[in-house]
């Protein structure tokens, strides 16, 4: 009987070891896939604009995968893939028109600051994180969607998004944000 109990104990010990090893390895792999690159800039922007740092990381993760030299086919630049026209407009909004050129968007510190400022602008303008994320991708057309009962039942929340690219984008950002919270900002990490 003690031999059978010993075998059960050994199997349980192996199971506990493998489970721990698997969880530890999975956590490390997840953190490699969801890094906290540019943490100084992200944490500063989160504080300055009262944004969840997990949201900023999620936008960067989705937009550029943290590549400071990223440039889209339509001309969006930097880690937060900001359009030069938006960057110029934001400089005017902040009273520093012409301080930077569009190539300054390749500087992660500048791009994260202005990208986060834009995200906060949309959050304040629309009042919900989901609408702010959609607007970060599609712009002020979100106003039309919120005023259309096909897309918003209450005029405040998007029930659906008519642009498949934007809907996919919002889903990716929300999923990435959940991972950042799980990996870095939850009590269990």
Each PLM stretch: what is its role?
Residues 1-5, 9:
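Single conserved hydrophobic/aromatic residue that forms the stacking wall/gate
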Residues 11-21:
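Hydrophobic alpha-helical membrane-insertion segments, chiefly the h-region
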């Amino acid at each position: 009987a003690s031999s059978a109990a010993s075998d059960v104990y050994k199997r349980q010990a192996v199971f506990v070891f493998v489970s721990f090893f698997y969880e530890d390895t999975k956590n490390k792999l997840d953190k490699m896939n969801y890094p906290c690159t540019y943490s100084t800039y992200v944490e500063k922007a989160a504080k300055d604009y009262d944004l969840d740092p997990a949201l900023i990381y999620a936008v960067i993760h989705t937009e550029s995968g943290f590549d400071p030299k990223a440039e889209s086919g339509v001309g969006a630049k930097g880690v937060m893939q900001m359009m030069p026209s938006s960057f110029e407009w934001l400089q005017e909004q902040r009273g520093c028109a012409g301080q930077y050129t569009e190539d300054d968007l390749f500087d992660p510190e500048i791009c994260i600051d202005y990208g986060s400022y834009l995200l906060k602008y949309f959050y304040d303008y629309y009042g919900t994180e989901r609408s702010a994320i959609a607007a970060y991708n599609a712009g002020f057309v979100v106003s039309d969607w919120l005023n259309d009962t096909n897309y918003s039942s209450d005029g405040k929340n998007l029930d659906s998004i008519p642009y498949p690219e934007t809907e996919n984008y919002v889903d990716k950002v929300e999923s990435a944000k959940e991972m950042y919270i799980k990996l870095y900002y939850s009590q269990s990490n």
